[in-house]
Amino acid sequence: MLACPLQHLMSYASSIVALSERVSAFSAEGKDYLQAEAAICGQEPVTVLLRAYADSVAAKALADRNPGDRLIVSGEASLQQPDGDVPIITASVVSSAFDDQYLNEVVIVGRIGSDAKDAESGKSTRRSVAVNRFYRSPDPAAQEPIEVTDWFSIRAFGFTKDRLTAADVGALVEINGCFTQMTNAEGKPYSEVKARMVRVHRGSKGGSNPAAGTSAVGYDHESFQGQPDECPINW
């Protein structure tokens, strides 16, 4: 659990993924990477982009992997720009995984950026949480870094829904959950974070189990309902 008060924003993911393509060189935001499309393994796979800095030990571990290889990866989570539909995991840890394993964990510390939008069923609500990132400008004359904001879409149920709904716009929140993949009205996939825990640090496909058929526990729908005896909403 992250200590309180929190002074910074961050987003981090640990997942077991299967590579969908061969690893290739890629450049973005003035940095060189190795990159491959992958999918978080499970009953409901989630498409992600897996990256590693080109000169990192994670890149060396990733370089010779083949499509279909299963990997445990952990690192910074961000969203593909400009649409923000596909999660990116920039791995600092890469290791081999077994077929019966499942892991899909996301921690986000950011600012609430929208009012709550309830599902038609009333069983869940969705809000956006902003996480700012900075990178060096490719212009040598530029003195200020370039700021990019990732807007993570958060889906919450049960008591977790109540906590997320009660948070003020601009509040600093900590979200613990997992990536899920949804489809919009045009049939285009996009990602959400299904919240297991929501904690407010400073004011200003619901029922399925994506780990079904594996040895993992803690991903059934009940694990995302929250508990009535958790910390109060304004903790």
Residue ranges and their predicted role:
Residues M1-A13, S20-D32, A39-P45, L49, ...:
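Acidic, gly/ser/pro-rich intrinsically disordered tails
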Residues V17, I72-G75, G110:
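Structured N-terminal alpha/beta-domain signature
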Residues A54:
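A positively charged, amphipathic N-terminal helix/segment that binds anionic biomolecules
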Residues A61-P67, E76-D83, A97-Q101:
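Short, charge-rich binding segments
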Residues G68-P82, A171-T183:
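Flexible glycine-rich surface loops and low-complexity tracts that mediate binding to linear polymers
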Residues D85-T90:
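Short, compact, well-ordered microdomains
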Residues V131:
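Flexible glycine-rich active-site/ligand-binding loops centered on an Asp-His dyad
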